[in-house]
Amino acid sequence: MNENLFTSFSAPTILGQPATIPIIMFPTLLIPTSKHLINNQLTTVQQNLIKLTLKQMMAPHNAKGQSWSLMLMSLITFITMTNLLGLLPHSFTPTTQLSMNLAMAIPLWAGTIITGLRFKTKNFLAHMLPQGTPTPLIPMLVMIETISLLIQPMALAVRLTANITAGHLLMHLIGNTMLTLSTINLSTTLLTSVLLMLLTILEIAVALIQAYVFTLLVNLYLHNNT
């Protein structure tokens, strides 16, 4: 059976209609919405992780930056759930789509830039020119700093897309190899299945780390502008 290696990254359809939006919104269904208090170990662990992450992210911020706490926690929760759901068999991972990652990165990056221009205009403009720069180099350095600023959202989106896509491609290749070897050599198939299991564990870690890195970089941009 010959299958395009990138078929699993194509946006799925249901009855001829794109199913991307329902899939993207699905992680929100996993968040409990009961008005009653739910006391169990899973909820306690979840709350402790949220408090720890929130404490680490909001520690260097002033009151203006801390107003973004709900946004950042929602972001890391959404990306984490989306990445993990994409590891399920025959599922679709929205974070492998550069368009979706850009749709998250550009508004968040623009929000931090607007915040900096509004509340700390002088400090924001001062970042465009390092102190002590020789006069002949000023135009070139301003241009370089401007370009580096403008490519920040692209770097955010490409980093997340590349890491998630690379892991899924490896799992796809090793899975196909295991199916092919199952009719040839049983011992080699077992070794390949162990390798696939280890790679799956690694991909779970990558899914968590990439969600944290994406949110942490947005948090860093916010810290530089508040």
Curated annotation (Swiss-Prot):
It is found in: Mitochondrion inner membrane. GO terms for molecular function: proton channel activity; proton-transporting ATP synthase activity, rotational mechanism. GO terms for biological process: proton motive force-driven ATP synthesis; proton transmembrane transport. It holds the Pfam family ATP-synt_A. Keywords: ATP synthesis, CF(0), Hydrogen ion transport, Ion transport, Membrane, Mitochondrion, Mitochondrion inner membrane, Transmembrane, Transmembrane helix, Transport. GO terms for cellular component: mitochondrial inner membrane; proton-transporting ATP synthase complex. Gene3D superfamilies: ATP synthase, F0 complex, subunit A. It is a multi-pass membrane protein. The chain crosses the membrane at residues 11-31, 68-88, 97-117, 138-158, 164-184, 194-214. It catalyses: H(+)(in) = H(+)(out). It comes from the Eukaryota. Belongs to the ATPase A chain family. Subunit a, of the mitochondrial membrane ATP synthase complex (F(1)F(0) ATP synthase or Complex V) that produces ATP from ADP in the presence of a proton gradient across the membrane which is generated by electron transport complexes of the respiratory chain. ATP synthase complex consist of a soluble F(1) head domain - the catalytic core - and a membrane F(1) domain - the membrane proton channel. These two domains are linked by a central stalk rotating inside the F(1) region and a stationary peripheral stalk. NCBIfam families: ATP_synt_6_or_A. Component of the ATP synthase complex composed at least of ATP5F1A/subunit alpha, ATP5F1B/subunit beta, ATP5MC1/subunit c (homooctomer), MT-ATP6/subunit a, MT-ATP8/subunit 8, ATP5ME/subunit e, ATP5MF/subunit f, ATP5MG/subunit g, ATP5MK/subunit k, ATP5MJ/subunit j, ATP5F1C/subunit gamma, ATP5F1D/subunit delta, ATP5F1E/subunit epsilon, ATP5PF/subunit F6, ATP5PB/subunit b, ATP5PD/subunit d, ATP5PO/subunit OSCP. This is ATP synthase F(0) complex subunit a. The gene is MT-ATP6.
